């Protein structure tokens, strides 16, 4: 469960290291975001010569949460930290060309097939 002010790790090579959620998209009073949801983020920590810089406001998709995601068979997939992949504001395609760490099968929609194909492991 990601809400406003939540700090997340970045799971791609866009140049950002830590980001903060500033808005959960998808409704005027929506409070929480889970795996597969799009959020508005600001870059809090970035590496030099990256594609993004500190202070940029972009969209991102949540790929891992500590809360986890419940499957129809009753199992729950949980992770050690919250992570997201930064998206281009207009096309909503990933800015980075590599994805680090596993992602869940819940991202397998028409929008995020690029992330699934770049990920080293799909759980």
Curated annotation (Swiss-Prot):
Superkingdom of the organism of origin: Bacteria
Gene: rplN
Function: Binds to 23S rRNA. Forms part of two intersubunit bridges in the 70S ribosome.
Descriptive protein name: Large ribosomal subunit protein uL14
UniProt-listed SUPFAM superfamilies: Ribosomal protein L14
Source organism: Erwinia tasmaniensis (strain DSM 17950 / CFBP 7177 / CIP 109463 / NCPPB 4357 / Et1/99)
GO MF entry, a single one: large ribosomal subunit rRNA binding
Biological processes, Gene Ontology terms: translation
Xref: Pfam families: Ribosomal_L14 (PF00238)
The entry's keywords: Ribonucleoprotein, Ribosomal protein, RNA-binding, rRNA-binding
Subunit structure: Part of the 50S ribosomal subunit. Forms a cluster with proteins L3 and L19. In the 70S ribosome, L14 and L19 interact and together make contacts with the 16S rRNA in bridges B5 and B8.
GO CC entries: cytosolic large ribosomal subunit
Bilayer-spanning residue ranges: none
Gene3D superfamilies reported in the protein's UniProt record: Ribosomal protein L14
């Amino acid at each position: 469960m990601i809400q406003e002010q939540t700090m997340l790790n970045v799971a791609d090579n866009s140049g950002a290291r830590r980001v903060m959620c500033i808005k959960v998209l998808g409704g005027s009073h929506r409070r929480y975001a889970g795996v597969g949801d799009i959020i508005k983020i600001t870059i809090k920590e970035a590496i030099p010569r990256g594609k993004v810089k500190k202070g940029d406001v972009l969209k991102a998709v949540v790929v891992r949460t500590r809360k986890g995601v419940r499957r129809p068979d009753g199992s729950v997939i949980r992770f050690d930290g919250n992570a997201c992949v930064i998206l281009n504001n207009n096309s909503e395609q990933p800015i980075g060309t590599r994805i680090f760490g596993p992602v869940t099968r819940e991202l397998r929609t028409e929008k995020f097939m690029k992330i699934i194909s770049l990920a080293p492991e799909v759980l």
